[in-house]
Curated annotation (Swiss-Prot):
Family classification: Belongs to the UreD family.
Keyword Transmembrane on entry: no
Compartments where located: Cytoplasm
Gene that produces this protein: ureD
Name of the protein in question: Urease accessory protein UreD
Amino acid sequence: MTAYQAIDRHASGHRFDTERRWAAALELGFEARAESEPTPVTRLVRRRHHGPLRVQRPFYPEGKTGCCHVYLLHPPGGLVSGDELRIEATVAEGGHALLTTPAAAKLYKADSHGVAWGQHTRLQVAKDAILEYLPQETIAFDGSRGLQTTTIELATGARTLGWEVLALGRPASDLPFATGALEQRFHLSLDGQPLWLERQLLDPKHRRFNGPWGQGGATVQATLWAVGLDDEAAAIDVLRAQLPDHNRWAVTRRRGVLLLRYLGTERNEAWALCEQAWHLLRPMLASVPAHTPRIWLT
């Protein structure tokens, strides 16, 4: 079992200075178990939480022996200065889990001290296991400051598909992302060897943010990844043939990782693109059709 470091007594609580912290952590473990069915059943066998971050119960909308769906719940609904969220999930050999969230996450404006928030996600997938990480979109309010890290550790034979959809500011309310700074880090490895490393700093004051060689003034971006496809080239051909034909997205593959990117101005368009890509890729990755989580329909 992964052990969390002890939280200092001043690291979490009601403080309103530069040392303010409010920590929350969630640790999940999934295993494929041979029960009465001839096909193993993926069970949520470990669930530890600290603070306002938890799950209620697993769902099996694809049948008892199908993928185990779990909703990650953060009742506050967003991150403010000093919040520190840590999510860890492990899928053991032969298991199949899907993680999602019930609503869009919100990154609120930093306090007067400029204290940042942090969100750190670590996903571990064993041999012949599958993990789908499909959170709903994240909305960064003007003035938000924080660090988001996503670490995915795969064993040989593991498969994974996931995405991150980020909307900057609230342009419909004439509230653009004009101040603040967000940093995103991705680290995906296979047997300890890096396959995809990426660091992105989103600072509206930097010329890269509006430059055509950078963000180009786009307010919405998305990244979808997939590892474990038998034929990546064929998968790319399917995406190019069936996804909407416009210049706001592109797809490529590198070192066994399929990457689809979106850069535009429409949050719903980015989400729809990722969801449609998932519907196309899932049968190729997991040999089962996509089954939309019920929470997305509410």
